[in-house]
Regions:
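C-terminal interaction surface of TIR/SEFIR-family domains
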Residues: 1-39, 68-77, 81-82, 98-101, ...
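Flexible domain-boundary/linker segments
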Residues: 50-53, 96, 106, 127
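An anion/phosphate-binding loop that grips the pyrophosphate of nucleotide cofactors and donors
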Residues: 86
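Glycine-rich, N-terminal phosphate-binding loop of Rossmann-like dinucleotide-binding domains
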Residues: 93
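Hydrophobic acceptor-binding patch used for acceptor engagement in glycosyltransferases
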Residues: 89-90
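Short mixed-charge
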Residues: 42-62, 129
């Protein structure tokens, strides 16, 4: 997200976005999605950063996750509305996520809105653009982004999950 470099973060504060981000995940990865939501919502931006950028929020919230934020509409209506109302889309990527129609639809929705640069792949298992399809963690819509549109993920296996969560910020 790199808040200090985001000129449009003020739009979210001014009411353009209801959610700071939307976490998309496969139900088997729910434990990690819940952990990430809690970690991000409780993360306090450094005081020095907030002092230099007074329009920044001190915390990164709210973050939409279906188990905590769904309302009474149909599942599809609720999810699509929440996606449109979210500044960022965090995709919990794993080989399991590649099998989820809902995860892929959410990614495609952000792409269709012209917001692929606001998608943050959070790799918890597998490998992006893997040679072995069984190890692939990017859903088809993410894999479709090539060249200048390609997105690289944040991998918890590189520095551990806590450091990876901070990289999301």
């Amino acid at each position: 997200m790199h808040l200090a470099n985001e000129p449009h973060v003020n739009n979210m504060i001014d009411g353009k976005y209801e959610y700071f981000s939307f976490i998309s995940y496969r139900w088997e990865d729910e434990k990690m999605a819940k952990w990430l939501q809690e970690k991000l919502e409780h993360y306090k931006l450094p005081t020095s950063l907030c002092e230099q950028n007074p329009d920044l929020p001190t915390h990164i919230r709210p973050i939409f996750r279906d188990k905590t934020d769904l309302n009474g509409h149909t599942l599809e209506e609720s999810l699509m509305s929440a996606l449109e109302s979210s500044r960022y889309l965090i995709v919990t990527c794993s080989p399991r996520a590649t099998q989820s129609e809902w995860v892929n639809r959410g990614i495609q929705k952000f792409i269709d809105l012209g917001r692929e640069k606001d998608i943050i792949p959070f790799i918890i298992d597998g490998e992006a653009n893997a040679d072995d399809p069984k190890n692939e963690c990017f859903p088809p819509a993410l894999r479709s982004l090539k060249g200048e549109r390609a997105i690289y993920g944040i991998n918890i296996n590189d520095n551990g999950r806590d450091a990876a969560a901070v990289k999301v910020v």
